[in-house]
């Protein structure tokens, strides 16, 4: 049977099977959702609608709402620590390294309201989800090692 000019045709979908892109998009939208509404107020169905994916796919990728929340925290801390690592603090004199670290931290927090909101929300939870993440513990451990190194070198 041929389509006539009046027969509706299905539009080609712009969706592609790109799990990494989909997960990155989910994390981006979920970051805003959790930052602005907290864990309790965020809704998976709103995240799904904003990312043109299904709740089922979100649960497939992240396991649960809490799993998505932990992934958001891991991504947020990971971005910060990655930039921090590029400061090459070990190559600088201790006082200058500390100055650069403090300035970076201030500038990062000043320019990343969602990060501050996530930290505040997690503080309300008494660090419950930060404590569950081995990745965040490792990331924050490296930050503590950096400060310890600066102290040992003479700050």
PLM feature spans:
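Short secondary-structure transition hinges
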Residues: 100, 106-149
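Short, structured helix-loop boundary elements
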Residues: 16, 23-24, 44, 66, ...
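Helix-turn-helix
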Residues: 2, 25, 29, 33-67, ...
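Residues in soluble alpha-helical coiled-coils and helical-bundle/repeat scaffolds
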Residues: 63-67, 71, 78, 89-92, ...
């Amino acid at each position: 049977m041929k389509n006539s000019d009046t027969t509706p045709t299905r539009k080609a979908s712009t969706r592609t099977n790109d799990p990494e892109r989909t997960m990155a998009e989910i994390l981006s939208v979920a970051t805003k959702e959790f930052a602005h509404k907290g864990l309790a107020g965020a809704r998976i169905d709103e995240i799904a609608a904003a990312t043109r994916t299904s709740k089922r796919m979100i649960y497939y990728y992240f396991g649960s709402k809490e799993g998505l929340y932990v992934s958001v925290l891991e991504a947020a801390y990971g971005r910060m620590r990655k930039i921090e690592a590029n400061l090459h603090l070990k190559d600088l004199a201790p006082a200058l390294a500390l100055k650069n670290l403090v300035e970076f931290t201030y500038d990062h927090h000043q320019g990343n309201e969602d990060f501050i909101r996530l930290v505040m929300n997690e503080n309300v939870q008494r660090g419950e989800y930060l404590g569950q993440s081995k990745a965040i513990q490792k990331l924050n451990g490296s930050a503590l090692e950096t400060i310890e190194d600066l102290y040992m070198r003479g700050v």
